[in-house]
Amino acid sequence: MNKTRNKILNQCETLMLDMDGTVLDLSYDSHIWLKIIPEKLAEKRDIPITSAISFMNEHVIRMKNTLEWYCIDNWSKLLDIDVLEIHRAEKERIRYLPGAKSFLQEISNSSIRVILVSNSHRDTLNLKLKETDLGDYFEDIYLSHDFVYPKENPLFWRELIAKE
């Protein structure tokens, strides 16, 4: 580790990391949510792709910062599309961000407790764990679905602190 990072981390007992966009490349999720799902919705409803995108955007705005937004079961029901199956079909796109794996390897050799804290749905987390060795680097994994609040809600953090 470089000296500045090492100095900061030497003062750290526990390091909480997010998964998507922090450790794993967000392009996997972006591809699914911004391209594949709107295409599937347009095809299923026989509507223009722009209408499918508008429909999704309306619901994104309505559900933003809620657990519904992160729940693939909710989206599957709303869209009448198997969202988990789409995630599985695109699994070859799951990858670490550049430098993330080497950072995790380095930090796992330290005395710092590393935990994953994510808004991910359990099923998509399990898929990502299966496709990577990500689970090897974390002592604990906490999901917002387990606490019934998204990370954006202060109650999530209260529940997490109580559990810790």
Predicted regions located by residue number:
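Glycine-rich phosphate-binding loop signature in dinucleotide/nucleotide-binding domains
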Residues: 8-10, 109-112, 163-164
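Conserved functional loop/turn residues at catalytic and ligand-binding sites
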Residues: 16, 23, 111, 133, ...
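Residues within well-ordered alpha helices
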Residues: 40-41, 75, 106, 128, ...
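Secondary-structure boundary motif
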Residues: 43, 106-109, 134, 162
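Short, flexible, glycine/charge-rich loop motifs used to bind or transfer phosphoryl groups or to couple energy/partner
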Residues: 2-7, 104, 130-132, 160-162
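Substrate-recognition "cap/lid" segment bordering the active-site pocket of phosphatases
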Residues: 115, 121-164
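Catalytic-core regions built around general acid/base machinery
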Residues: 99-111
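N-terminal helical cap/lid subdomain that shapes the substrate entry/recognition surface
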Residues: 5-102, 121-123
